[in-house]
Regions:
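Compositionally biased, intrinsically disordered low-complexity regions enriched for acidic
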Residues: 1-2
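Charge-patterned, phosphorylation-rich low-complexity C-terminal interaction regions
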Residues: 6-436
């Protein structure tokens, strides 16, 4: 499971970061969750005392906006040398591929892939090598990756991926392409991310899942449409996104900075982050950057790190502006979908009804931990301040569930605590230190 491996990688990154910190250093988040010092023999761990200051507005410790944000993004795009995807998109010059045209192109692609796979299984000869080269060129042309951005809406390559057949073909195609072609495909996927149906239609599918179990509430789409969308989102996550994450784990920090800058330049990054695929992509980029930053054998150059932090500052400001960080959580969005007077949490406890909000929120807590690892002190203060209510409500719900007399599966009451600790451990805090 890709997301499970991502969570384990984040936990390793957090542990490695803690080991590097000097002993006796003080870690605190004053004015939000309280103050905590590292434990010593003479100064044992103290329980955090939460002080709710009524006059303090959320986000009052917000970090200042990154200076020259557009310049930081533009420089990252130039240094990464991402080709045509980094240029301004042209206006649409032709109609998008129809469903019939897309399916016909996919049939040709499948035929080319089968031929190439057969040639690779046979002993290599000069004739087979020449045939492979010719077929690979035809495959690359048929994919239409290099067609200019904005040539149609959606892009021809995106039109192919808006079919489940197209998504399932991507892993086989990646194995047949050169490293440069694979990078170009990744660049196009990131540049066109929000136009992919698995991202563009995600909110409608999510809203259907929340509202469908309820009587007298009409979901935004039909059951048939929801089934098709769910199949498409699963295919994208298991095929396309899996290959994207695998390729991201081979890139340098300069390219990672460029990819993140490209995602923000060509897409509404906050809208993307409110989707499961968007959170997975952002987590993969931040996880790779932190792994490179911690690399002992070949650490990134100082200018690469400076550029990374500049681009990351732009991302943080766009995600945290106007107190929008909580909206990245499924549980927050699900509450906004509910009609007035309906208790979504009690609905979610009924088997077979709305999705488990704790399981849906887990990848977001994972991303918040990565964000905290990269953030400076002022950004960490904003992060904790904006998520304060989310943190406390999870801890309170976990304690109430533990004290309840209702039978629960073993360890079920710890899911919320585990989610919260993904973030708190990155800040050298722990849910056990918080008293309510």
């Amino acid at each position: 499971n890709a997301m499970l491996r991502m969570q384990q990688q984040v936990e390793r990154l957090v542990d490695n970061r803690k080991k590097r910190e000097a002993k006796g250093a003080v870690s605190s988040q004053a004015g939000t969750l309280g103050r905590v010092s590292l434990v010593t023999a003479n100064k044992p761990r103290q329980m955090l005392q939460l002080i709710n200051q009524p006059g303090e507005a959320p986000g009052s410790h917000a970090a200042p906006a990154t200076h020259n944000q557009e310049d930081a993004v533009r420089m990252a795009l130039q240094d990464a040398a991402l080709g045509d995807a980094a240029r301004a998109p042209q206006s649409a010059t032709r109609k998008a591929l129809t469903r019939r045209e897309s399916l016909a192109a996919l049939e040709r692609l499948y035929h080319l892939v089968l031929q190439l796979e057969q040639l690779r299984r046979e002993p290599s000869t000069p004739e087979s090598t020449a045939a492979q080269k010719q077929l690979t060129e035809a495959l690359w042309k048929e994919l239409r990756v290099l067609e200019p951005l904005g040539v149609s809406d959606p892009h021809p390559f995106v039109s192919l991926l808006n079919h489940v057949k197209g998504k399932k073909l991507i892993p086989r195609v990646f194995r047949l392409l050169s490293a440069e072609q694979a990078l170009a495909m990744l660049t196009m996927l990131i540049a066109s991310f929000e136009s992919l149906d698995a991202v563009k239609e995600f909110a409608q599918w999510e809203k259907y899942r929340v509202l469908d179990p309820m009587r007298h509430v009409r979901p935004p789409i039909s059951a048939h449409q929801a089934t098709d969308l769910g199949r498409s989102i699963d295919a994208f996550s298991n095929s396309v996104l899996f290959q994207m994450m695998a390729l991201i784990n081979t890139l340098s920090l300069r390219i990672i900075s460029g990819m993140l800058a490209l995602l923000m330049e060509r897409n509404h990054v906050l809208a993307c982050a409110r989707t499961r695929p968007g959170i997975s992509l952002l987590s993969a980029l931040l996880s790779r950057a932190e792994a490179l930053r911690q690399a002992a054998n070949a650490p990134p150059a100082a200018d690469e790190l400076e550029q990374w932090y500049s681009v990351l500052g732009v991302l943080f400001n766009r995600l945290s502006s106007d107190g929008q960080l909580p909206s990245l959580f499924y549980s927050t969005r699900a509450a906004s979908y509910m009609p007035f007077g309906v208790d979504m949490f009690s609905l979610g406890t009924v088997p077979g009804h709305a999705p488990d909000s704790n399981a849906e929120d887990e990848p977001v807590w994972n991303f918040m931990a990565l964000l905290a690892i990269h953030a400076n002190l002022s950004q960490q203060q904003v992060l904790v301040q904006e998520l304060r209510e989310k943190i406390l409500s999870n801890i309170l719900a976990a304690k109430e569930a533990k004290a309840s007399s209702l039978p629960m599966p073993p360890g079920a009451e710890d899911v919320r605590i585990r989610n919260v600790n993904l973030l708190l451990h990155a800040l050298n805090l722990d849910a056990a230190q918080i008293t309510l």
